[in-house]
A protein has these predicted regions:
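Short coil/turn linker and secondary-structure boundary residues
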Residues: 47-50, 66, 143-147
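Long, low-complexity, intrinsically disordered polar/charged segments
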Residues: 4-9, 60-62, 69-71, 92
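Metal-dependent phosphoesterase signature
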Residues: 53-86
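C-terminal cap/substrate-recognition subdomain and adjoining C-terminal extension
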Residues: 2-8, 76-156
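Active-site neighborhood of HAD-like aspartate-dependent phosphohydrolases
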Residues: 1-53, 57
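Broad structural signal for hydrophobic residues in well-ordered alpha-helices, predominantly aliphatic
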Residues: 26, 59-60, 113, 155
Length: 156
């Protein structure tokens, strides 16, 4: 297949590669009240009452102090949909480029996921970690509502 026929295939991770929403799994790990609050915030986001940025800030401030090691353990426990790896491999074998994008999964985890699944790249939100602990601060293009569009434009 020539480069002219090579296509960029983009997968969102939450609910597509991962069976569930990483933000909710992260909140559940912080206790039932954090989970209920995160679920409610996700609902408000889904009806356009909250922006992406505010949703992420409110969820990640609740996990301030979480050990980076615990973040990795939660990621490792997150279940993927059946055949995710096989599907990406078949797309790669067809000569296409696979990108993984998420506004709810930290970038360090997305890079690892892309490597595990043999995707071309992975992009997530920037979660500040200082001395091995989450500070509750977030950043990066994907922490904003139009962030996915901006990342796609960069990839093109």
């Amino acid at each position: 297949m020539s480069d002219n026929n090579k296509k960029l295939i983009i997968f969102d991770v939450d609910g597509v590669i991962f069976k569930s929403q990483f933000l909710l799994c992260l909140s559940r790990n912080s206790g039932i009240l954090s989970y209920i609050r995160a679920w409610y915030l996700c609902f408000l986001f889904s009806i356009n009452y909250l922006s992406m940025r505010i949703l992420l800030e409110k969820v990640f401030i609740r996990v301030k102090g979480l050990k980076e090691e615990d973040l990795w353990q939660l990621y490792c426990k997150t279940k993927m949909v059946a055949n995710a790896e096989k599907t990406i491999q078949e797309i790669n074998n067809s000569g296409h480029y696979v990108a993984l994008i998420s506004s709810g999964v930290p970038d360090i985890l997305m890079k690892d996921l892309a490597e595990k699944l043999d995707a071309g790249c992975g992009y997530g939100i920037d979660v500040k970690i200082d001395s091995g602990f989450c500070t509750g601060e977030i950043g990066g293009l994907l922490s904003y509502s139009d962030g996915k569009l901006q990342v796609v434009e960069i990839l093109l």
